[in-house]
């Protein structure tokens, strides 16, 4: 789990990947150490309230990315998964493995019914993860996210709990 004490390392990772992440993530272009610390405090609160969590992806003792649940709708028994990975560590299956573990947690530990993932239409690497894991493409949310001065269309993927 990511915790406030990870702020420096996580921020340095964002700094190294800022140009890459800023193409897809609305927060990346101007993320600060203070903003990273505030995000980690928020995710600790969510975890304490049983309303999601953020996990670190660690490779060779270093944080190389993050993946987690930004919240849980306990009435609908649904959640979404968000993720990002250091550009140098892509293409190794790390994020697919992490997202698979999160999906298993959502269905097996939380007994949820539905998991969603959204990815920018043009972000093929991000889209490949839900596609590999059997998520169903459910539609396009046109100009659904503003990143810098442009709007991105997002593909919505959904996966239902096995029956």
State where each predicted segment sits.
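Positions that flank functional sites
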Residues: 29, 121-122, 145
